[in-house]
Amino acid sequence: MWSDIETSKDLLGYSIHASLLKDVITNPKNLPITVGLYGDWGSGKSSILKILQEQLEKDDDTVVVYFDGWSFENFDDAKMALIQGIVDALESNEKFFAKVKDDAKGAMDAVTEAFVKLKKSINWMRMLKFTTKAALPVASAVISGGASIIPTLISVFQENKEHLTDILTGDKAEEFLQNAINSEDNEKKYKAVREFRTDFEALINKSKQGRIVILIDDLDRCLPRHIIDNLEAIKLFLNVPKTAFVIAADQYIVSNAIKSEYKTIIEASKEDRHHDNLGEAYMEKFIQLPYILPKLSPKEVETYVTLLFCQSALNEQDFFKSTKRFHLICE
């Protein structure tokens, strides 16, 4: 019986996918970027992330952090949990400090102080109750464009929701959004988002690292609301220069989760010819590069099973030779 967990041992020739993704996210011209690694459950997404992680960790200019999206499932405030988790992971990552630890004492202190400031910002945002549905959509609209959060805004501003899409995509979009953030409460939240983004970008620059890569697995196993929360947290708070996110998920499950979360909106806008594609359109606003894994052919499945039997029958040295020959043949 074989283990049903991810592995960095490449028996399927998936290193080519990891290498292609590495080339994309290590190119400074492409950053910031969010990549969607799409495939069915059991298609090998998690293994590709592990292989990619190993490749990236060999790069002196890259700090990589791996997250299981499901690990935040028990938190009510999924947005803040993800942000806190990423900040904590960077703070505990020795490589993040590697380029400043031998510099003058001031450089190391600057990074440490930046972490303290970010943590205070997170606590402040928790106090502002960013879990409420109005604040983040409005701030997101101003930062990343109104159309990207139309579904959320419709769920918040129930009045005139039939006309909200037209308002946000028309000539009066800027005026509408500005009026929406003019309340004192939303003004504080909008300012907090801006300050966090500025401080997070400053932290990365002070570390002197070339890029920060966040690998997020199993997003599609989260509850629909948490799937959306995680995507919005990445786009709104963390998508700053020198960052790359690779999110492994079944795109159809994520899309259906979005449709499920906003099913009342879809019902209310049936006359809109775009409502059937709401899930896909919503995802496109967060994912710049969709990378879809091809399904295995029967021949590839046969080869994989053969290699599994070889792995169980051969010692480690002989099996390594066998897989090396296999990869040479594939090339």
Set out the residue ranges of the language-model regions:
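Walker A/P-loop-proximal flanking segment of P-loop NTPase domains
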Residues: M1-M80, Q84-D88, L203, L289, ...
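Short glycine-/polar-rich loops that comprise or flank the Walker A/P-loop
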Residues: P32, D60-V63, G210, V240-A244, ...
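Conserved nucleotide-binding/hydrolysis micro-motifs of P-loop NTPases
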Residues: W41-S43, S71-F75, D250-S255, K263, ...
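Short secondary-structure boundary/capping segments
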Residues: L52, A81-I86, D229-L231, S260-E267, ...
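P-loop NTPase nucleotide-binding core
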Residues: L56-E201, K206, K270-E271, L314-E316
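Conserved AAA+ ATPase small/helical "lid" subdomain
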Residues: D103-T132, M283-E331
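Conserved Walker B catalytic segment
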Residues: N186-R194, T198-N256, E261-K263
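Short regulatory helix/loop adjacent to the ATP-binding pocket of P-loop NTPases
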Residues: V254-K285
